[in-house]
Amino acid sequence: MYSNSNAFLGGANSLRPGQQPQQQQQQYGAPSPFGQQGPMQPQPTGFAPQPTGFAPQPTGFGQQQTGYGQQQQQPLQQQFTGYPGLQAPQQQPQLQQQFTGFQPQATGFQPQVTGFQPQATGFQPQAPQQQPFQTGMPPVPAIPQQFQQQQSFQQQQQQQQQPSIQQPQPTGFPSVQIQAPAQQPAPTAQGGIAPPPPVKPQATGFSEMAASFQTAGGKGRRAEQKTNTVKIPNIRLSFITAHDQARFETLFKSAVGEGQTTMSGEKARDLLLRSKLDGDSLSQIWTLADTTRSGQLHFPEFALAMYLCNLKITGKALPSVLPDHIKNEVSSMVDIINFSITDDAGSSSAPASNAPSFATQQNTAAVPTIQQPQPQPSNSAILQAQMTGFPAQQTGFMGQNQGLQPQQTGFPGMNPQPTGYAGPMPPMPPMPTGFGSNLSPNAGPGGMVAPLNSQPTGMPGQWGLVNTPATGLPLIDALQARMMPQLGREQRNYTTAGLQGNAVIPWAITKDEKTRYDALFRAWDGLNKGFIAGDAAIEIFGQSGLDKPDLERIWTLADNGNKGRLDLDEFAVAMHLIYRKLNGYPIPNQLPPELVPPSARNLSASIGMVKNMLHQESELRKNTGASLLPQKTGVSYLKGHSFKNTGANRKDATVFKNNDEEVGYRSSARRRVGTSPRPESPAASNSGDDLTIEQLRKKIKEKQVLLDAMDFNDEKNMEEDDILDRRDRREADELYRRIRRIQEDIDNHPDAQLMSADSDAERRALKRQLQQLTDRIPELASQVRKTEKAIADARLELFRLKDAKAHPNSAAAIVGTGPGGMVTESDRIKARAKAMMQQRTAALMGKKIDIGDDDADGPKRLEEENIKIKTEKENNERMVRDVEDSVREFAKGIEDSLKEGAPDSTSEHEKRRWEDALGVEDEVRDFIFDLQRESRAARIRSQDRQGGRKATQEPVKAEAPVSTRVETPSPSISRTSTPASTAGGGSYSSYKTPEERAAFIKQQAEQRMAERLAALGLKAPGKPGETAAQRAERERAERAEKRRQAEEEDARREAERQAKLAEEEGGPAPVASPKADSRPPPPPPSRKAGKADDRRDEEAAAKKAEEERLEREREEQERETRELEESAKAQEDELAKERAEADARLKALEEQVRLGKLKKEEEKRKKKAAMAEAKEKEAQLAARRAEIEAARKREEELRKQLEAIDDEDSSSSDEEGPEQITPQASTPTVGGSQVGTHEQEPNSPPPPAPASVASPPQIVTTSPNAERESRNPYFKMMSQSSEASTSSVAAPVASPPPPADVSTNPFHRMTQAAAAPAAAVSSAVSGAVSGISDAISGVMPSRRRPNDDDDDDWGSEKGSDDEDSDDEGRPGGNSAAALASILFGTMAPPRPLSATGEKPTASTPPVVSSPSSPPPPPAPVEPSAGSPPPPPPPPPGPPPAPSGGAPPPPPPPPPMPESGAPAAPPPPPPPGPPPAPGAVPPPPPPPPGGAPAPSLPAGRPAGLLGEIQAGRALKKTQTKDKSQAAVAGRVLD
């Protein structure tokens, strides 16, 4: 239906400018706008001899012939008509001659011209234009003069009828622009409708092709030649701008010249040197740019080099490796150039960009008269009419025409033109009126429009399609109508009027929009090519009325990849951007993700990834030799593309290997019959048959000669092999010797012992230690910060106090509420308001308020001080942070250094290979094992040479580092090390002459022999060069060292034995005194003669050096040992003194206890005599019986306690001995006080007693028991109570002398003795003593004046106990009697009497005598109190007194004594014999006294410690005693 190319894409026949004829003809082979006359021109050439014969045909079938000729004779020439410069001007004369020859045909053609007035009018201006036009198109025959007038008339008539159609037609005549100045007047024949000057804007229709023809034909030819010389793919490079790419292309073309596609290295160097960059930079740029490593630059590589130069000039760093996307782009473009895949459509003035030129689109529409009429619809009608004239040809042509019909969809009005010859005009009106109706008939035959319109519905969600907004899409219909192809649109000057609005449009394309845009795309894509070219886009987008810059930006955004055309999705994106722009939205600088089509989203990235993968694979195969593996290993690289088929039967070319031995063709094999064997070669079978005997002999001789020669060669080769083997063996032996020497040097090195250490384990231990220390950093920093904050707050508070004191009249300091206690403005306002309120209140009340003079200065001073403190705090914080950072850096450095030496897989492999002999030959393995055995033997020999040094070093291993430090300063080491090292013989290579080497080897052999003799216990011969005096001195030093070591060991063992015996006996451990050297030194070993002197000298020098070093080590060790012994002796002396003092105190306490018991008995007897009633006597009798029984039990308990104390003394350690001196029997009585002292035991086991009181705690060392019974909760309390009781009792009793000086004990030195003031200690001790004496003496002391103090103390204790009695939980009714029975073991009255003294003694803590015992015993105690009258025997008496200790619940009142004993400690360990520790305190009361003693070091009242640490029973017992004591005391008085 349509004769020519796609009218909807701006083809030659279309009425729109801008289509490039060459593109159309390339794709579809459609004829040019002159396609009908063009074919007529070749017809005459083909039928030149037949003009007369064809004369009738032109008249009747002129049109058909032209059409037939167009189709059959010269279809190729029609295709070339679209290429402006393909035909040479030489054809002009031929064309003119042809025309002259065909004048008769022209006459026959006349009806055609008249019938096709539009065509004739279109050709009117071409008669004068033929000469220049021929350069761009095939020759067109000149129209005879006789038809000029008719044509002009017809042209005018057509212009009147269809001016709108005729004007745009000139766009199909690219050659019109090339008119020569002489030919320009020709258009005036058109009646002035098309003046010559406006022809220039016509270039807009061919912006990409005809730009080179804008001035003249010559220029056009030159441009053609240039474009033909250097063809550059029309591909945009993303890393440079389009403008830069255009400039680089121009520069590249000018530098390359004609016929070249690459720039030589010399030219590239000259161009790059203009950048004034240094040589290194240019070298790096060349390395990066020359991706093909060919020494030449393709255009993309040249552009890359210019881009890199620009980077360097602007101060940016050059990349070491090209980014992947740049490398892939450059390589792709280079490949296209190398394969000559170029896009000629892009040969325009701006070849770097495929974007269409919107430069003059507006002007073309504004000057419609520029375009000349071209009745192209009539051409199509003519062609179709020719079909009807030739049915057979028509069918063939109809197929072609039907194939071209989709292109004609842009011109639906042309459908009726084929049916009617004279009707091109009538069908035109329907075109503008409605395009849709005309589109449907065109699309109907193709069947494409309907399904394509529905396709967008399936696309939403793929690349941002969204539903239409609720507000709808205003003016979208108007935009669609404006954009549809229609006649006469070229004459219009489009504006945005009627399309602008302010609708709300989302970024994403709506479904409705996509449907409309797809319909637009298909309307313009008449041939269903799937894209719209740039020149068509100029026309389409220009109808929107937007400015050229906006359209250019929209094109740039929509044309992804700079292809120069838009597909369906990209066209929708461009239309959407136009629609947004019309509604007031700005054009984005970058396409948002919602508008990126799926086809272009990840295309470049995926291509780049595939390229990278291929490149990496090829590099890997090239570098690793994998490309050769199939030939070597048979590994198959065949890729399997199926999940089901294994492909086992497929031929694998990757493992193919040609067999050179295999012969492809064997004639004998081909001619064999069946399975018969291959016949023998005739030459092989008959070769020996024809030879004579002489010939055979000759051959035998020759073979013999050859055999002899072969034997000779074999012998020669064997000799050479033997020589090589011997040489290799010598070299191997030499290597073995060298390795052995090096191993010997290693073994003889002084630090060889360190090699045995497990470096990995040590490294791991160091890492753990480093990690632990590093973990402590935050904690320490936090503590430091807390301390800093506390200091700052304290300083601020101190300043407030000082300021208030210095300025008493100043206003009250303002309390700051700001951060860090800062005073804010609100605080000042509040303070002023408060002051004003106070003044007003005072004024109302008539008072007067003094306002300080420096009211304003106070806050200032506070603020300054606050700022000062804060500044100092910040400085300290910075210092802490700096310390933290430095410590972390240091730790990191240490960790890195530890990691550096860590073994890796390679080193581990090497170690296993060369140390464990894995994976080596047998000979090498044997050699390695031999070396290891020799190394072990060498270590053993070195240890034997050192003698017993190692044994002595083990006890003092901790001091080893000290000795090493002491060694280093001595200069003798360096002096002796030199001979030692030389003697080691590790420098074999240093000897040059054979004699020296022989002497050296001999020396080494002698040395090894001496070592072996020493290992066997034999005396090695004297060292060469060693005199008798030196040898004697050395041996004397060795004997002395051994003797010292033996004596030190004996002394140490003796000291341990004595200490153990002393502990078992309970006496002070004897101090081990160093024994004088009594043993005579052993006689020097007899010297064996018979060894060379030189060897003796060397051995003597080496041994002397070693002896000196060992001597220094021994001296250091001896010094440290002496110091340890001295300190141990001092400690033992102190312990002995303490034991002696403890014994004396125990004796005194025992005597005091006995006297106290006697006094209590006397008091009981007096009380019993005072009572006349029989009831009291019975009670006394019962009490006496109970006391007797209790006395027996008490005696047993005291014996047990004594044994336990002895055991404890024997097993106690030096450290804990002084702390737990009191017997455990007594300890229970003072549970609370003991705990206080026990806490201080580690520092100062013995409480720092004042001079007045001897340090009692050191009576007996019970640390062993403490260790065994540390799980007992009462252990601490009991031990301390015993200590306290002993100390308190010691004071009242004059018999025990106070200890000379407690400080002599090293443990005392460590204690906090100095912490407690002497006065507090003395008072506490006195209170404790008084309490104990009261408890011992019972009522007797209370009656005496001297015991008043004790009574007071006791009373004070009770007072404190009363306060804490609630804690005890003992029964209150029986508390008095129970206390009495517990404390005094006799009647109740004596206890009250003892407690009568109610004068509180601050120093004495409450007597918590029964910490561990349960309360039950108190009840029975009351009866015992009543029974006191019968005087129990003295032994029983003492036990009752101890009863003060809380008895175990089970025993009745009498058990009180029992309870005292058991209560003392947890029953098992506590029971200590009364004698030693004071089971003495058997009367638990002493423990109260003891309680103060522990409190002494702490300086706190003993009662407080008693409350905290003592048992509840003690407190309650004291409370009861107090009440009873008060009453009884008064009665007694």
Swiss-Prot record:
Polar residues bias: start-end ranges: 360-378, 393-410, 1221-1237
Ranges of biased composition (kind: Acidic residues): 1204-1218, 1348-1367
Subunit structure, as described in the record: Component of the PAN1 actin cytoskeleton-regulatory complex.
Bias kind Pro residues: ranges: 1412-1495
GO molecular function, one term: calcium ion binding
Domain WH2: 1500-1517
Subcellular location: Cell membrane; Endosome membrane; Cytoplasm, Cytoskeleton, Actin patch
Chain's role: Component of the PAN1 actin cytoskeleton-regulatory complex required for the internalization of endosomes during actin-coupled endocytosis. The complex links the site of endocytosis to the cell membrane-associated actin cytoskeleton. Mediates uptake of external molecules and vacuolar degradation of plasma membrane proteins. Plays a role in the proper organization of the cell membrane-associated actin cytoskeleton and promotes its destabilization.
Biased composition annotated in UniProt, kind: Basic and acidic residues: 649-664, 894-916, 935-947, 1031-1063, 1090-1164, 1173-1203
Name the record gives this protein: Actin cytoskeleton-regulatory complex protein pan-1
Keyword annotations: Actin-binding, Cell membrane, Coiled coil, Cytoplasm, Cytoskeleton, Endocytosis, Endosome, Membrane, Repeat
Compositional bias per record (Low complexity), positions renumbered to this chain: 19-46, 53-136, 143-170, 177-193, 345-359, 968-982, 1279-1293
CC terms in the record's Gene Ontology section: actin cortical patch; cytoplasm; endosome membrane; plasma membrane
Native source species: Neurospora crassa (strain ATCC 24698 / 74-OR23-1A / CBS 708.71 / DSM 1257 / FGSC 987)
Topological type in the membrane: Peripheral membrane protein
InterPro entries listed in its UniProt record: DUF1720 (IPR013182), EF-hand-dom_pair (IPR011992), EF_hand_dom (IPR002048), EH_dom (IPR000261)
Region ranges (Disordered): 1-204, 345-378, 393-423, 649-691, 894-917, 935-1306, 1334-1533
Family assignment from sequence similarity: Belongs to the PAN1 family.
Coiled coil stretches, renumbered: 690-890, 1026-1209
